[in-house]
A protein has these predicted regions:
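Anionic-ligand binding region
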Residues: 51, 56-61, 70-75
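A short alpha-helix capping/helix-coil boundary motif
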Residues: 68-71, 95
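Residue-level recognition of beta-strand microenvironments
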Residues: 28-30, 57, 136
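Hydrophobic residues on conserved beta-strands that form the core of alpha/beta folds
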Residues: 25, 53-54, 67, 132-133, ...
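HTH-adjacent hinge/linker in prokaryotic transcriptional regulators
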Residues: 1-49, 78-103, 158-163
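C-terminal regulatory/effector modules of DNA-binding transcriptional regulators
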Residues: 47, 60-63, 75-76, 82-84, ...
Length: 163
């Protein structure tokens, strides 16, 4: 399999390249309430403000490889839900428009099997092996982290990263 540097701070778009990476929006950014974020604890402050929730499908050479669910605290991100994310880098939008840069974080990696939702997005059989990465991404803004759950079809691509 070819390597994809998703396990880094740079983000998927910069690791793969904008030319071969496409992004389809499954659920447009919307504000919802939240009590937890993929198993990561939230502060009372984070819970009270709600989050911006979105789902994206990332394709490499038109093949679905990542199904990404993102939850971002709804705090000082004006017009975020009205932005276009189709074929755009989330990290770049956060950096350019909100002066937020990912500085580190925590990730949990687990092997699972494809459920109906994954079958629909990846076009694989039910039970197909899938890698799930739950991430808490810390930023340069003190006390501001956001969260993602990424389902990875590693059949043709492996995940790589330096540590």
């Amino acid at each position: 399999p070819k390597g994809i540097g998703i396990l880094s701070l740079s983000g998927t778009t910069s690791a793969i390249g904008q030319d071969i990476l496409k992004t389809r929006i499954i659920v447009k950014p919307k504000i919802i309430s939240w009590e937890q974020a993929f198993g990561f604890e939230l502060s009372e402050r984070e819970k009270s403000m709600g989050c911006i929730y979105m789902e994206r499908l990332r394709l490499i050479n038109d093949q679905p490889v990542f199904y990404d669910i993102t939850m971002i605290p709804n705090l000082n991100l004006p017009r975020f839900t009205s932005r276009t994310f189709e074929n755009k880098s989330l990290f770049e939008i956060l950096r350019k428009h909100y002066q937020l840069e990912v500085k580190g974080g925590e990730q949990k990696i687990q092997a699972i099997t494809a459920d109906d939702r994954i079958v629909e997005h990846f076009g694989v059989n039910r039970g197909h092996p899938i890698l799930r990465v739950d991430r808490k991404l810390d930023t340069n803004r003190i006390g501001f982290s956001f969260f993602s759950q990424i389902y990875c079809n590693t059949e043709d691509y492996s995940l790589i990263g330096r540590f």
